[in-house]
């Protein structure tokens, strides 16, 4: 009898693990962590997650040579919404990407979304294979 009572608890134990490995969460892995252009960029540091699974998010960097950070945010939404992925902006700033000299400078803040953690942005860029050999400086 005790065994049957224990088996009744099994769905409550297994359910959290099923959420961790949901196919919805696997779609986050397909989103590139970094997308920036050469030259002067306005960038956003973004936490992405599938709807309902905010605990299992991923932080990405998106930047473009545009007039304001809102245009970068609009492009992020165009990219992620069809996949069913939600975005929370952690802050923004500017990135000067000198690809020919292998240098990147991260600085400034976004008037719309506030300042990003530039050190975290640098760590994400350094982990990305394209920018691992670049000299990345952060100016607060």
From Swiss-Prot:
Annotated catalytic residues: 69
Gene Ontology biological process: cell differentiation; sex differentiation
Domain of life: Eukaryota
Signal sequence annotation: none
Cellular compartments per GO CC: cytosol
Organ and tissue specificity: Germline cells of adult males.
Record-linked Pfam families: Ocnus
Record's protein name: Sex-regulated protein janus-B
Organism: Drosophila melanogaster
Gene: janB
């Amino acid at each position: 009898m005790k065994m049957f009572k224990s088996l009744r608890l099994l769905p409550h134990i297994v359910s959290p693990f099923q959420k961790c490995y949901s196919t919805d969460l696997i779609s986050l892995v397909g989103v590139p962590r970094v997308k920036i252009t050469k030259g002067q960029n306005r960038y956003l540091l973004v936490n992405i997650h599938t709807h309902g699974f905010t605990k299992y998010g991923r932080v990405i960097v998106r930047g473009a040579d545009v007039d304001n950070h809102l245009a970068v945010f609009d492009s992020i939404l165009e990219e992620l919404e069809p996949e069913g992925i939600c975005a929370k902006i952690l802050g923004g700033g500017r990135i000067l990407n000198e690809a020919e000299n292998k240098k990147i400078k991260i600085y400034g803040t976004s008037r719309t979304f506030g300042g990003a953690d530039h050190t975290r942005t640098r760590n994400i860029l350094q982990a990305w294979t394209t920018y691992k050999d670049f000299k990345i400086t952060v100016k607060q």
